[in-house]
Amino acid sequence: MSWDDNLTFEDPSPNLALRAQYQLAMYALHLSCGHSIYCRSIKAATIEQYVFAAATLIASFSGVDFRKDSPSDKHMGHILAPVYRDLKKFESVPDRREPYDPQMHALAKRLATRFPRDSLVPALVDGFEQGYCAGYRLTEWAQSGNRSDPTKPQLNHMVSATIRTRAVVPDDFRVLTTTLQRSAGLSIIEFDLTVIAKMWVKFRTQKNGQHGEEKLFTRNPNPSGFCFVSSVFRALQRFHRLRVKDPRLSPSKTPLSVYWDPRPQCVKLIASGDIEMFMRRLAGAVYNMHPARHSADLQKWSAHSLRVGACVVLHAMGFSALDIQWILRWRSTAFMVYLRNVAILATQQYLALDRGAALPFI
């Protein structure tokens, strides 16, 4: 609007109420582009709350709700209503992430054996395995954007705790051995992996607001299967080795997911770009997708695919909605939008029909 004033454009809406509604509509569009207080995109319902707050502030001086054409109207004005409608319509378009699946993980584990144990690929594979078991959100184990400096991880300044690192750090883990000995942090690797009976991880910062929640995991006796305990143990060993190279790594402040980058010869944090690059290459190899011709489809694999994949597998294996909510730390049934018609479900259906056909029907 300052630009308009500088060019001496005339106001097309000299009417105060109409001008105010235009401003509120532009504010809603501004918010929809990610210009919120947290500099990220927000839902249409949240945008309505932002606009409501702005309109309430204005009404405290003017005594008029400028969101409506007339004070007696029950609905939004003719300018603001279409903006709200389009925002909700845009949200309803399905743009779901594709699931990270066991086939992709099997390929990832084979590839990891070709790289040094402290390099990016083995670190990613361990992070993927943890995420698949615990339903990690991106910020719970990695960094958004290209943030890779181990001394500058993402922090949560909204919690009053000594540890404010958003991603889990070595000190967030504790174990109980088969001989009932307890240990935490980097001291865990002083034990042999085979004697660890239970492991707890503390999520100090969660999207659902349940800060400080702890989850229990046990060690999978199958050495080739998914195992949260084993993958964390390898990550702790990697952290300990890299700490020798970079003493700045802190068990209480530095995220667990670190790796050695040989080109600049330094320790780095795993970032979302690393995750997306590797996961999309895995998807391309498993599903025979070309990087250029299928680039739009490959964009649907990201860090969130770990949570989606875990949800799909648990549902296909017969876990109840309550079980999935509890295991993957959902506070609602929002995970339902991620479910897929996978081969496991089709096979389970046939088995159920065959068992039913073998029983007396009447």
What are these regions (language model features)?
Residues 1-362:
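Extended, non-catalytic subsegments within catalytic or DNA/protein-binding/adaptor domains
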